Amino acid sequence: KQYSQDSITIETMVDVENFFPNSLGSLEQFNWAVTHESARERLRFFLDECLCLFGTFQDAIDQNDSILFHSLLAPYLNSGLLDPMECIVDAISEYKKPGERIPLNSLEGFVRQILGWREFIRGVYWDNMPQYKESNFWSHEKSLTSSWYDGTTGIPPLDDAIKDSLEHGYTHHINRLMIISNMMNLTGITPNDTYKWFMEMYVDSSDW
């Protein structure tokens, strides 16, 4: 789905180019909703076109497709354009429609991503901050190198995920969790560097 860019969005993009000329990523592929109405359209598109196969492919990775059947709703949830319960209620309503078009594993997977992961972790965040941000359970001490910022680590799935993140300001949760975060942990990258990288890379990054 393509979103039209209003005057405020265009002005903001010009400001970003002028004031942050050396920032990560690119605005060439910018295609995100900036209003509640447009975010609702994205939710509707996901429910109509993607939810039916989300359960089967929710943990898949594809070198040539970073979207697959994912909802792309995280930026709208984190910015307040959509409410988590709003998305859950709409998904359940879609599941209950006659015809059994939406399989249970798709509904469960989507609801779990919002309620069982996002909202649970948000609760952990509020219950443990600010000390949680300074914790370092594994005592990691290594810093990120430039290859983590341009996708030249030499590890194909990791480089693919990094380059995808740079191009779109987004990559799905399996790339983030199972590939990027996992490799940062296995190579001993400090939590502060990890946090900084994720905050710099994604359109849905924001402190709660």
Segments predicted by a language model, with ranges:
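Glycine/tryptophan-enriched, flexible segments
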Residues: K1-F110
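Active-site-proximal binding-pocket segments
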Residues: L72, L77, L82-W208
